[in-house]
């Protein structure tokens, strides 16, 4: 299958509207972050019975989207399915962006933001997921950069190697994120099933994100997308949702 990539000229009305919308979201996010810093993180919904505010909730969601999106790119990079090659680049790019977004959410949740760049590395504890996860996150971003470079320059051997590493690393990233929440509040949280449930949720949300992004971007740029590929991704999403529902059923059965 011969696939050729073309750059978007960025002159269409739809493209400009999309950029304006994204710019609006960016400005709103910066203003909201400034407001949180000025007023304190209590404005995100934290109080005595809710130890996590909006940032931590969104950080977990962003990291899940990142890990799930990277798995989609593995359909081409790891398993060699050439029909998914057009989605590989955007999947890796989205994975990197959402992980950075998750890390920014965590940073704004800290009372002393500067410490987050020092403490996990100076006082490293191999038995603490809070020490291990920063290594996983930074490694994830680095792997995505190398993966993108290999995809753009058509380095097939390197793509295969890095894609395989990225595929496994994505599971480690969200397994580590799920392990942070392994506290004794509910039965599922006390068991090894929690990291697995986080991975399942990540794959479901990441696949859903990729379907939305692919369909939207192809329509806005007047490009044709193979319906069969979207249908296959939809079936994969359905399986992931069923797995997530199973975990929810197990959690709430007590």
Where are these regions (language model features)?
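Glycine-centered flexibility motif
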Residues: 38-40, 53, 64, 98, ...
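Short hydrophobic alpha-helical membrane-anchoring segments
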Residues: 32-36, 73, 77, 105-106, ...
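N-terminal signal-anchor module of multipass membrane proteins
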Residues: 1-68, 72
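Long, contiguous internal "core" modules enriched in hydrophobic/ aromatic residues
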Residues: 8, 13-15, 19-28, 81-83, ...
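Membrane helical hairpin/interfacial module
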Residues: 50-115, 132, 136
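Membrane-helix interface motif
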Residues: 33-43, 107-117, 177-185, 250-254
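Intrinsic structural disorder
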Residues: 46-50, 55-59, 95, 201-204, ...
């Amino acid at each position: 299958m011969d696939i050729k990539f073309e750059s978007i000229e960025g002159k269409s009305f739809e493209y400009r509207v999309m950029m304006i919308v994204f710019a609006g979201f960016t400005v709103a996010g910066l203003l909201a972050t400034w407001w949180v810093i000025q007023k304190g993180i209590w404005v995100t919904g934290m109080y005595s019975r809710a130890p996590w505010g909006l940032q931590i909730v969104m950080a977990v969601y962003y990291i899940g989207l990142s890990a799930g999106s990277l798995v989609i790119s593995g359909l081409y990079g790891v398993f060699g399915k050439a029909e998914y090659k057009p989605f590989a680049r955007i999947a890796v790019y989205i994975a990197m962006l959402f992980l950075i977004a998750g890390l920014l959410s965590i940073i704004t949740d800290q009372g002393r933001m500067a410490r987050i760049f020092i403490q996990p590395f100076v006082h490293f504890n191999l038995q603490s997921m809070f020490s291990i996860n920063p290594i996983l996150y930074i490694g994830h971003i680095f792997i995505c950069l190398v993966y993108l470079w290999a995809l753009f320059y058509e380095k097939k051997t390197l793509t295969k190697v890095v894609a395989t590493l990225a595929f496994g690393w994505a599971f480690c990233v969200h397994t580590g994120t799920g392990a942070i929440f392994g506290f004794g509040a509910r039965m599922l949280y006390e068991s090894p099933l929690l990291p697995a449930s986080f991975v399942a949720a990540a794959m479901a949300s990441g696949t859903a994100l990729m379907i939305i992004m692919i369909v939207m971007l192809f329509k806005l740029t007047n490009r044709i997308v193979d319906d069969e590929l979207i249908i296959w991704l939809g079936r994969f999403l359905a399986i992931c949702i069923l797995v997530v529902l199973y975990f929810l059923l197990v959690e709430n059965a007590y």
